[in-house]
Amino acid sequence: MGLDMYIVKKDKAAGPLSDENYDDSNDVAYWRKFNALHGWFVEHIQNGVDDCGSYEISKEQLFDLLEVLEEAYALKDASKLPPTPGFFFGSYEVDQWYWDKVASARDTISSLIDDTDWEKYKLYYFASW
């Protein structure tokens, strides 16, 4: 039990992501208990609503997130990506584990931006706990 976070890729022709057609998507990113990153998605993608729903992510939104991750890591400034409280969300400490997660997420998001065929696919974020 805990915060599990996913980005999935789905062919645009297959329609929006839903419980009924989830099997038609591919997981392209996964994080466990990285509550600071989840908080960013809730505030910037989910309009402040933390409801375990799936939300489409644009290339521009990923660029915004990449900028936050790069600045936070370069400046070692956790205020750019603050820990987010929640039930079974993991540690709220800003320690080496946190910075390792920021660096890993930065690399993952950069790869998603570069490697996604944006004409053919949509990306969606969702989390469960």
Regions found by a protein language model. Name each.
Residues 1-129:
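Acidic (Asp/Glu-rich) sequence patches and key acidic residues
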